Amino acid sequence: MVKATKAEKKIAYDTKLCQLIDEYTQILVVAADNVGSTQLQNIRKGLRGDSVVLMGKNTMMKRSVRIHSENTGNTAILNLLPLLQGNVGLIFTKGDLKEVSEEVAKYKVGAPARVGLVAPIDVVVQPGNTGLDPSQTSFFQVLNIPTKINKGTVEIITPVELIKQGDKVGSSEAALLAKLGIRPFSYGLVVQSVYDNGSVFSPEVLDLTEDQLVEKFASGISMVTSLALAVSYPTLAAAPHMFINAYKNALAIAVATEYTFPQAEKVKEYLKDPSKFAVASVAAVSADAGGGAPAAAKVEEKEESDEEDYGGDFGLFDEE
């Protein structure tokens, strides 16, 4: 079988990536540092059905994206270009983005601290018995780790931050962690960005609940409304408040001048004679309380009638 030339491989890659862009509208951009071929194969199997994992050189991916944009006029896909930095791959999916992201995270595997590797996290060695014999104390002394001999083995006395995040792993740290059987790092595909129908956002957005989204949306509307009111710029959210403020201003002008309009007449009338406020409130209270008065009168009248009838009965007995 004749091997494909480099040019033919590029054309095949362009064709495949363009087909995937046509078929899928959701793409996860994932970092693939320290991910082995076996691990990547397991991820592909786990996502099989509604997702496709595509790896490749950044230059090839960028070239294919530009070709697709030129051929189809899809300029939104160009938003992917700034995201193709470093050792990254693309996961094309038709599934729920959060579920796919969670599935990818399941395939992280533990890894030893190799010399020269940049630590993705802080590495802290906890106190306790190491199981190492006293002849191994030199490893601890080089790293200034306080120890003691307990029952013929080396015991670490206090927690020690062996490697800080971002630092390179040294030979002494790597050797000690290997002797302790500690695999401090875990590697897998890490979602860096999410592309969805032309929009690009952080993967943290996938963790937001519906209540959090509503809260953020309400907060945004409140901020926009406040800004619109401050600069007197009409928006749908600010319009009701602007109308109310305008009405208050017009009312204040009408009260202070001879200018008037129907809604201002009643206000002016009350301001000229404040006692009308009291009359109106008393009338309202009387109207509320008056409903129970007839019923009370009827009850009282009925009680008086009963007493009269009862007294008449005694009169009949007296005559006999």
UniProtKB/Swiss-Prot annotation:
Q: Which residues carry this modification: Phosphoserine?
A: S305
Q: Which residues carry this modification: Phosphotyrosine?
A: Y310
Q: Which Pfam families match?
A: Ribosomal_60s, Ribosomal_L10, RL10P_insert
Report a single Gene Ontology molecular function: mRNA binding
Which segments carry the region annotation Disordered? 289-320
**Presence of keyword Glycoprotein:** no
> Which terms under GO biological process does the entry name?
response to cadmium ion; response to zinc ion; ribosome biogenesis
- Residue spans of biased composition, Acidic residues class: 302-320
Example GO CC term: the record gives: plasmodesma
Please name the CDD domains in this protein's record: Ribosomal_P0_L10e
Q: Which UniProt keywords apply?
A: Phosphoprotein, Ribonucleoprotein, Ribosomal protein
Do you know which Gene3D superfamilies this protein is assigned to? Answer: 3.30.70.1730, 3.90.105.20
Answer yes or no on keyword Ribonucleoprotein.
Answer: yes
The task this protein performs is described as: Ribosomal protein P0 is the functional equivalent of E.coli protein L10.
What family does the database annotate?
A: Belongs to the universal ribosomal protein uL10 family.
Subunit info?
P0 forms a pentameric complex by interaction with dimers of P1 and P2.
Name the UniProt record assigns to this protein: Large ribosomal subunit protein uL10y
Species of origin reads Arabidopsis thaliana
Q: Gene behind this chain?
A: RPP0B
